[in-house]
Amino acid sequence: MKIDKKSLKRIVKVLLNKVPKEEAALIKVSDDLTLIQEIYRKDKDFRNFILNPSAPYEDKKKIIDSLSEKAGLDPVVKEALEYIVKTNKGNLLKIIGDEFRFEVEKFFATVKGEIITAYPIDEETINSVKEVVEKKLGKKVEFDIKQDPSIIGGIIVKAGSYILDSSLKTYLQKLEQQLTAF
């Protein structure tokens, strides 16, 4: 089922207008939407039920009420979920968290990123990478630091649309492609 981008943007805009423009409130709604998105992606039964047009809205609403209560969802998120389900646009749940987070990042002029290394790195290195990326993007960047021994060495930096992969693993893969091309 194709994603209706127009509806997605409209729903995200309504959410942004209903949520107080305070960092804590926006982060709470963003986290709630990300949780819903993850449940939608990982729980096949939930996804199939939400997408089933012949399932009565009242039954879907009961699931939303239960989920909202258990997860402590913000009332604005619950209201948006009910609207999405009522209008049979359940497939929007696949990306609504990403879209909302993108709009919040634009609002705060911040970008979420990640630094991936094979081994632990010190604060000084993190700060220098952060400084370079912020200068390049012209926005504040908040990095999650991850370790992935499979990259062997080097660093991978992702922030918004900016990706720098100087890992040894990627270098070796490119070298292998060049050598086997002959």
UniProtKB/Swiss-Prot annotation:
GO molecular function, one term: proton-transporting ATP synthase activity, rotational mechanism
Compartments, as annotated in UniProt: Cell inner membrane
Any one Gene Ontology cellular component term annotated for this protein: proton-transporting ATP synthase complex
Main location: membrane
Membrane topology (UniProt): Peripheral membrane protein
Keywords annotated in UniProt: ATP synthesis, Cell inner membrane, Cell membrane, CF(1), Hydrogen ion transport, Ion transport, Membrane, Transport
Subunit structure: F-type ATPases have 2 components, F(1) - the catalytic core - and F(0) - the membrane proton channel. F(1) has five subunits: alpha(3), beta(3), gamma(1), delta(1), epsilon(1). F(0) has three main subunits: a(1), b(2) and c(10-14). The alpha and beta chains form an alternating ring which encloses part of the gamma chain. F(1) is attached to F(0) by a central stalk formed by the gamma and epsilon chains, while a peripheral stalk is formed by the delta and b chains.
PANTHER family membership: ATP SYNTHASE DELTA CHAIN
Xref: HAMAP family: ATP_synth_delta_bact (MF_01416)
UniProt family annotation: Belongs to the ATPase delta chain family.
NCBIfam families, A to Z: ATP_synt_delta
Function (record text): F(1)F(0) ATP synthase produces ATP from ADP in the presence of a proton or sodium gradient. F-type ATPases consist of two structural domains, F(1) containing the extramembraneous catalytic core and F(0) containing the membrane proton channel, linked together by a central stalk and a peripheral stalk. During catalysis, ATP synthesis in the catalytic domain of F(1) is coupled via a rotary mechanism of the central stalk subunits to proton translocation.
Protein name, entry field: ATP synthase subunit delta
Taxonomic source organism: Persephonella marina (strain DSM 14350 / EX-H1)
